[in-house]
Amino acid sequence: MLKNPATKYRPFPAIALADRTWPNKTITRAPIWMSTDLRDGNQALFEPMNAERKMRMFKMLVQIGFKEIEAAFPAASQTDFDFVRELIEGGHIPDGVAIEVLTQAREDLIRRTMESLRGAKRAIIHVYNATAPVFRRTVFNTDREGVKRIAVQSAKLIREIAQTMPETQWTYQYSPEVFSGTELDFALEVCNAVTEVWEPTPEHKIIFNLPATVEMATPNIYADQIEWMHRNLARRDSIILSVHPHNDRGTAVAAAELAVMAGADRVEGCLFGNGERTGNVDIVTLALNLYSQGVDPELDFSHINDVARTCEDCTQLPVHPRHPYVGDLVFTAFSGSHQDAIKKGFAVQKPDAPWEMPYLPIDPADVGRTYDSIIRVNSQSGKGGIAYLLESGYGVAMPRRLQVEFSSTVQKLTDASGREATGADIWALFQQTYLRSDGAIGYVSHRLTERDDGSQHIRLVVNIDDHEHICEGSGNGPLDALVHALSHVLTAPVSIHHYEERALGQGANADAIAFAELAATGVAGSVFGVGVDANLTTASIRAVVGGVNRLIARTGQGMLRRSSAQATVA
């Protein structure tokens, strides 16, 4: 790179539009959408689509809701010409949908292109020629008058041919190619000259498409250009003002949105931003940006994964995993703080309330995505994401301190493996950590009775070193009685710091899950035990026994009183 890029590159000049109005505008309705996937998108592929893939793409575009679809560049190849004929003769174009075809401003190409449309009910004939100074000098070696003459002559020829094909409802479209690099006064001069030839009316409008064939400046500059044309075009009420942004600077979506605010009625683009070089503007992102603001985009992306897979199959181009709204990772949070915020957001979000969710601009369900992949766990994740995966996938709603405890266990797993931990991985680790049955003390059975004084008495059968033993104890409640019973086989007193219980899932037949936080005298910290059983009391006993086993493991079996465990204790 140059130390001083100013010696090679010049900044794009600002537009003199001191009273611009677009910054104060809001988009309140969708523009007219025109898909150029089958033309601009197709010509930019390593391997252009064959007829079968083009037809598959066309039918999907119709299903999504596009009313204008640029089908081909018929004069460019026999394949494109034949595809247009198949659309017409095969009856594939629904009522209310117009196909568009593109031609350069040359007589032979215009005649060939118009012939491809013979018999169509509705058609848009789109002619273009480059108007920018660099093209006038370098490519065509002509002046302004020469460029305008080409546009006017082409417009006249198109009108003459169209009048010989009255069975078709025609819409004429003209593009000053490289509009973004053309002097505004000259772009206006050429467009107004074409208007004089085509003589549009408010009932029969023409389209002027103003492309950022190459994106040359910031989106506000393009918006200024569009607003200037919007104000100054002759017969503006008889013109559909269209934009065709490319993404060379990475801001095509912003450019299109600001252009609509500046007066554009129509947007041309491709699904997922396919197209020459860095691509056309992405209509999916534009449409769903509108949707996220409560504006009906008039395109249906309810099954966005299906749209993405079809595009990938037809174009042989992958959709990036972080592509807005559709990428595999766009509704995914790995960060611990993000996961915690999303988990809390889902807890308070009501089905009929406005969507207010941390880190998720739209509800994934609206585009056919599930919540399964929203929270994924790697070495950067925190307790919130882990808790969400266990609760959403397995019904385990952990107490907060258990979330903290278990997250460190998961962290060790992801640090060691260096990979993402799936919900299944986390559930398996949870079972291995809290629900294993091979602890020092194995629960066998119990009998709980209430004494005359209101206290509870438990007769607990446990397995220690492959021998069954009976431990008995009394207390103010079942858990207090259980702790007293277990004290006979432990060298240190155990206390229950926290206890929670809830259903594991929904319905009358759901198992119970219990969580007990235990501490022992002389043992640093506390640990959790978890118990699952169809019977709530049994689940609570399993939780306490599980926690005791984890304390015993922490002390290297030092807490287990084996000498007393060789016989029945009471």
UniProtKB/Swiss-Prot annotation:
Give me the Gene Ontology terms describing cellular component: cytoplasm
EC number assigned by the record:
2.3.3.13
Q: What class of enzyme is it?
A: transferase
At the top level, the lineage of the source is: Bacteria
Q: Which GO terms describe its molecular function?
A: 2-isopropylmalate synthase activity; acetyl-CoA C-acetyltransferase activity; magnesium ion binding
Q: Which UniProt keywords apply?
A: Amino-acid biosynthesis, Branched-chain amino acid biosynthesis, Cytoplasm, Leucine biosynthesis, Magnesium, Metal-binding, Transferase
What reaction does this enzyme carry out catalytically? 3-methyl-2-oxobutanoate + acetyl-CoA + H2O = (2S)-2-isopropylmalate + CoA + H(+)
Localization of this protein: Cytoplasm
Binding residues for Mg(2+), per the UniProt record?
D40, H244, H246, N280
A biological process from GO: L-leucine biosynthetic process
Give the Pyruvate carboxyltransferase domain ranges. Answer: 31-305
UniProt xrefs under InterPro entries:
2-isopropylmalate_synth_dimer, AIPM/Hcit_synth_CS, Aldolase_TIM, IPM_Synthase, LeuA-like_post-cat, LeuA_allosteric_dom_sf, LeuA_N_DRE-TIM, PYR_CT
Cofactor(s) demanded: Mg(2+)
Q: In which pathway does it act?
A: Amino-acid biosynthesis; L-leucine biosynthesis; L-leucine from 3-methyl-2-oxobutanoate: step 1/4
* CDD domains hit by this protein: DRE_TIM_LeuA (cd07942)
Q: Where is this region: Regulatory domain?
A: 437-570
**Cross-referenced SMART domains:** LeuA_dimer (SM00917)
Family affiliation: Belongs to the alpha-IPM synthase/homocitrate synthase family. LeuA type 2 subfamily.
Q: What's this protein's function?
A: Catalyzes the condensation of the acetyl group of acetyl-CoA with 3-methyl-2-oxobutanoate (2-ketoisovalerate) to form 3-carboxy-3-hydroxy-4-methylpentanoate (2-isopropylmalate).
Its assembly, as annotated, is: Homodimer.
HAMAP family noted in UniProt: LeuA_type2 (MF_00572)
Q: What is this protein called?
A: 2-isopropylmalate synthase
